[in-house]
Swiss-Prot record:
Coiled coil: none
CDD domains: NMNAT (cd02165)
Taxonomic lineage of the native organism: Bacteria, Bacillati, Actinomycetota, Actinomycetes, Kitasatosporales
GO MF annotation, one: nicotinamide-nucleotide adenylyltransferase activity
Protein name (Swiss-Prot/TrEMBL): Probable nicotinate-nucleotide adenylyltransferase
The protein's role, per its UniProt record: Catalyzes the reversible adenylation of nicotinate mononucleotide (NaMN) to nicotinic acid adenine dinucleotide (NaAD).
Organism field: Streptomyces coelicolor (strain ATCC BAA-471 / A3(2) / M145)
Amino acid sequence: MGGTFDPIHHGHLVAASEVAAQFQLDEVVFVPTGQPWQKSHRAVSAAEDRYLMTVVATVENPQFSVSRIDIDRGGPTYTVDTLRDLRALNPDADLFFITGADALAQILTWRDSEELFSLAHFIGVTRPGHTLTDAGLPKGGVSLVEVPALAISSTDCRARVAKGDPVWYLVPDGVVRYIDKRHLYRGE
């Protein structure tokens, strides 16, 4: 599951859990982006902070792990590079890339989009306010999944922290403590 995870929240975790169950996945690997190319218009928390928050949020689930593959590569993060690297590390694995419906709608604008579907099967999950559609995407290359609706976004979580509002129960407890300890999102 790729994402900025700035911060990771319960919506991400529920989506990963639902997809793992529906597709009988052995493992869900969370891959925080290093330098997300499509978010250059706004400040993004340090990659190490986003990685550590993701570790804190997923550590209790034995089916979840976190990869540094994008963070350690350096340069802008492109999904095609992530999938090429994961394929090289796991040549016999069936790779599934979990993403939000909003991101899936933009997938044909991503770098080397024609190659993406040969590297992994894409799973688009619902996000509040976004309609699921696979129109224009390769047949058999995408699955759409309904997940329990949680109207939580990382953008809202950052805004709440910046205003001094609580994010308890929106993000995992350990992530709340990490945000507080590192004074993240205070100046946004």
